Every structure is written in structure tokens, then in C-alpha cells.
Design a protein with these regions (language model features):
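Alpha-helical segment proximal to the catalytic Tyr-Lys
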Residues: 127, 176-180, 251
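Short C-terminal tail/terminal secondary-structure segment
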Residues: 3, 152, 231, 241-244, ...
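Substrate-binding pocket helix/loop in short-chain dehydrogenase/reductase
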Residues: 98-99, 103-111, 223
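Short, small/polar-rich loop/turn modules that mediate ligand/substrate recognition or access, typified
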Residues: 179, 184-186, 253-255
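Canonical Rossmann dinucleotide-binding motif of NAD(H)/NADP(H)-dependent dehydrogenases/reductases
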Residues: 3-34
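Active-site helix of classical SDR
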Residues: 122, 163, 171
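Residue(s) in the substrate-gating loop at a strand-loop-helix junction
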Residues: 147
Length: 267
């Protein structure tokens, strides 16, 4: 039996990167997966590739900052697959500016995607997750994408760090609220280090600017070396952690922070 046999998942920001890798591993583990994103062409392509590989997947357009988009996306998922067991709040953006450079518009965009998106997703999916959780021995699951800088500070991206810290706190609060209300919904966060993908490239470029380093190849090597394990993370590294948190193997975990950062925060 596969780890997620019979489960139905929704993954936001899943047209590429960690989200797409998560959708792929979830399908491989037996789940039916709806993917939501703003990037319609890439999103349809990702869903199509999952179906061509023998999985069940559907793409829905989603702007995570809009409550009506969330309502339509979750409704479409439930209508298409018959329910919802897993929500992965993956969509996020990066801002590499210090406080003095940042504008109110920067903050509003960052907060809209990284915080409002997680809140709206959780709120909208809650009725479907409550229903499926009540019928499952280990309950349903929410996994929120935070960051290693949601646990420690960041000199190069303080407002990004603030939003990721907010996700960490929100995760713990929702775990406690749902437990108090006897909802069978587990809520956990995952905290990546620097990942070798598009957003990771933005983080490496920001570190290079902060250090006055113009050689991006050297900056990449320095970022790799900054992780005690000696390399950057991959999207698959994080996707494996998400699949674990979504599965019954994590049935005794709620309000937890799964750190997958190559040892960065151990220093």
C-alpha cells in the first residue's frame, strides 16, 4: 500500500518548484492531487504530465490573495475528486530588501501572498478537512511552507523572515485551536534551507549583494558551504518532508516544525 493511497490533496503554488515536486511525489504515493497557481500554462502542463504518468491530477487557477479564488479552487477540488484530505499551503514569494529599502507596497504584496494566502487557504479548506478528518483514524492534514528564517532572523531579507515567522506561529496556533475544538486536523510547518530552484537563486543573489560578491558561481558555492551538510537543498528534499507530514506516519505530529535545512539552524 502506498503512503497516501485514497487521499485527496490540494497544493498551492504547484506549477513549478517545491509545489510541483510535492504534487509529483504525492501522486506517486497514491494521492489524487489538485494544483493551484497563477501560472496557468505551466500549471496545466504540470497536471498533464502527472496524468500522463498514470496519476490523477487537475489544475485550477488560483490567486492565493483572493478569497473568491480560494473558494472556487477548493469547491472544484471537492467536486472533481469527492473530498479533501490534505492542504499544502506552498505558494510564496521572496523579498530581498532591508528595512530602509522596503516600501509599503513591497510589504503588502509579500504579506498578501505569504500570510494572507495561508490564512485564506486554511479557512476555506477547513469544512472539507473537518469532514474527511472525522472519518480518518489519523485525521486530515495541513502543511504550511515556512523557512529556516521563520525560525531565526535574516539580515538580508527581514520582512520575508517576518512573514515566514508568522506562518510558524500561525501553524502552532491552528494546531492548538483545532485540537481544542476536537477537529481531527493535524497542522504542521516545514522549514527549508536554501533550495536549488528559482527562489533559492534569488536568495543566493541577495546574499551575494549583501557580501559585495559579484561572482555568482562563487556565491552559489558559498551558499552551499554555508549549510553544514555541504550542499543546497533540492525541491525533492522538501517534497519528501511534505509527503511525510501529510501521511499517517506523522499521525502523532501537530503544531510541529519540520526543519529540512542541511544543518543551517543547528549552527
Amino acid at each position: 500500500m502506498n503512503r497516501l493511497d485514497g487521499k485527496i490533496a490540494f497544493v498551492s503554488g504547484a506549477a513549478r518548484g517545491i509545489g510541483a515536486a510535492t504534487a509529483r511525489l504525492m501522486v506517486d504515493a497514491g494521492a489524487k492531487v489538485a494544483i493551484g497557481d497563477l501560472l496557468d500554462e505551466r500549471g496545466h502542463e504540470t497536471a498533464r504530465s502527472l496524468k500522463e504518468a498514470g496519476g490523477q491530477s487537475v489544475y485550477v487557477h488560483l490567486d492565493v490573495t483572493r478569497a473568491d479564488d480560494w473558494g472556487a479552487a477548493i469547491a472544484a477540488t471537492v467536486a472533481h475528486f469527492g473530498g479533501l484530505d490534505i492542504l499544502v499551503n506552498n505558494a510564496g514569494i521572496f523579498l530581498a530588501k532591508d528595512l530602509e529599502e522596503s516600501t509599503k507596497a513591497d510589504w503588502e504584496r509579500l504579506c498578501g501572498v505569504n500570510l494572507t494566502g495561508v490564512i485564506l487557504g486554511t479557512q476555506t479548506a477547513l469544512p472539507a478537512l473537518r469532514e474527511s478528518g472525522a472519518a480518518s483514524p489519523q485525521g486530515s492534514a495541513i502543511i504550511n511552507l515556512s523557512s529556516m528564517v521563520g525560525l531565526v532572523g535574516s539580515a538580508m531579507a527581514p520582512l520575508y523572515s517576518l512573514t515566514k515567522g508568522g506562518i510558524t506561529s500561525f501553524t502552532k496556533s491552528m494546531a492548538l485551536e483545532f485540537a481544542r475544538k476536537r477537529y481531527r486536523i493535524r497542522v504542521n510547518s516545514i522549514h527549508p534551507g536554501i533550495i536549488d530552484d528559482e527562489m533559492g537563486g534569488q536568495a543566493i543573489a541577495a546574499r551575494a549583494r549583501m557580501k559585495g560578491e559579484a561572482d555568482m558561481e562563487l556565491a552559489h558555492a558559498q551558499a552551499s558551504a554555508a549549510h553544514p551538510i555541504g550542499r543546497l537543498g533540492t525541491v525533492t528534499d522538501i517534497a519528501h518532508g511534505i509527503v511525510f507530514l501529510a501521511s499517517d506516519d506523522a499521525g502523532f505530529m501537530t503544531g510541529s516544525a519540520l526543519v529540512v535545512d542541511g544543518g543551517w539552524t543547528a549552527q
